Amino acid sequence: MKERKFFGTDGIRGKVGSGQMTPELALKLGWAAGRVLSRSGTKKVIIGKDTRISGYMFESALEAGLSAAGLNVMLMGPMPTPAVAYLTRTFRAEAGVVISASHNPYYDNGIKFFSTDGSKLDDNLELEIEAELEKPLVCVESHLLGKVSRIEDARGRYIEYCKGNFPAEHTLTGLKIVVDCAHGATYHIAPAVFRELGAEVIAIGDKPNGMNINDKVGATSMGKICETVLAENADLGIALDGDGDRIMMVNSKGEVIDGDQILYILACDAKSRGVLRGGVVGTLMSNLGLDLALQALDIPFARSKVGDRYVMELLKELDWRIGGENSGHILNLDHGTTGDGIVAGILVLAAMRRQNATLEELTSAMEMLPQVLVNVRFEGEHDPLKSDKVKAAQAQVESELGVRGRVLLRKSGTEPLIRVMVEGDDHSAVLAHANLIADAVKSVS
């Protein structure tokens, strides 16, 4: 396949005002996408965004470009990424566009597309859009310009969709839940969803100002929610990231429940109800504890490359339904076409209600093994992973760890780094093993 110049694994992303994230490129991108998408279908595109101050600028630029290509545009305003995917499907739109840099700071932003079925845009369509980007922008004739409207009830539609994933015979009455919205796109959605299902909700990270998204709150900064759960004597906490496609949880003891543990809960619940199709897809970074816990239940487990795009690809290849990353991207293809933090939280709460169990009880049978990650910087064009010395160190550690441990060495795709990850039963031993391999990498760098 031809190498993509603009689109990465998750659309276009970068620092606002530099590189590709400029209003000029957004205008041209809207036009180029409109040219490709207008060849068939409804000629209707939905645009949603998170709460970054730059979102308004990019929304206007994309809107102008799409209209210039003859496509009608429907604006959602600040809404979670999975809400854009959902409403793209329900409105039978030709595509959905999300303006977000997910868990990144406010000064970054990004643009990604969903296809008409709510899944990530096909690689070939992205290549076609890139080809159009190389051409001069030519506006359609005035009578063919696209119209722009606003989806006034987008919030209500998505709230009802989320609630529809919770079993009608149960409620959340009696549960006190802390919900951290990361000052992001779920700020006006997530607290309402859990309140309407009956929970007492304490919302934090729900006051966006355009520049505080993901700032010391949310799924990538768990300190605040852990403190709040303990201070409020809450039953659990739910932390979302800036665009709402990622979730981490906290039990009543203030302990973090990560994506691997959430996958375990969902797989156990599906198996107990006889609806688990196949097994579970994790990634190369998934904790060995998840693998071992699923083995004990005779649930197959497979690993993809890191990234929810690759988890989705492997799920489709295996025809399985549940997969995700330890960072909190959770996919359940029986409940959506993309990662959805709110829905994943609802599914965990549904498992708690069905089994009349706490979050601690649902994760008690899964032992998270100590995991150490060491980053080693190297210089030059050579690949330290091809060194005999590094290979020998890895083989030695793997032999000593046996079946209760794991070693993963990989090169960073963005920096001159070798990432050394070691898992095992004993933290001090794991740390020593990781440093042994790291020293071998340093010696040949």
Swiss-Prot record:
GO biological process: carbohydrate metabolic process; peptidoglycan biosynthetic process; UDP-N-acetylglucosamine biosynthetic process
EC numbers, comma separated: 5.4.2.10
Catalyzed reactions per annotation: alpha-D-glucosamine 1-phosphate = D-glucosamine 6-phosphate
Gene name, Swiss-Prot/TrEMBL: glmM1
Binding site for Mg(2+): 102, 241, 243, 245
Cofactor: Mg(2+)
Role description: Catalyzes the conversion of glucosamine-6-phosphate to glucosamine-1-phosphate.
Record-stated family: Belongs to the phosphohexose mutase family.
InterPro entries named among the record's database cross-references: A-D-PHexomutase_a/b/a-I (IPR005844), A-D-PHexomutase_a/b/a-I/II/III (IPR016055), A-D-PHexomutase_a/b/a-II (IPR005845), A-D-PHexomutase_a/b/a-III (IPR005846), A-D-PHexomutase_C (IPR005843), A-D-PHexomutase_C_sf (IPR036900), A-D-PHexomutase_CS (IPR016066), Alpha-D-phosphohexomutase_SF (IPR005841)
Protein name as it appears in the record: Phosphoglucosamine mutase 1
PTM info: Activated by phosphorylation.
Gene3D superfamilies according to UniProt: Alpha-D-Glucose-1,6-Bisphosphate, subunit A, domain 3, Alpha-D-phosphohexomutase, C-terminal domain
Modified residues (Phosphoserine): 102
Cofactor: record remark: Binds 1 Mg(2+) ion per subunit.
Source species, domain of life: Bacteria
Pfam families referenced in this protein's UniProt entry, alphabetically: PGM_PMM_I, PGM_PMM_II, PGM_PMM_III, PGM_PMM_IV
PANTHER family, sorted: PHOSPHOGLUCOMUTASE (ALPHA-D-GLUCOSE-1,6-BISPHOSPHATE-DEPENDENT), PHOSPHOHEXOSE MUTASE
Metal-binding keyword on record: yes
Enzyme class: isomerase
GO CC annotation, single: cytosol
Keywords, in A-Z order: Isomerase, Magnesium, Metal-binding, Phosphoprotein
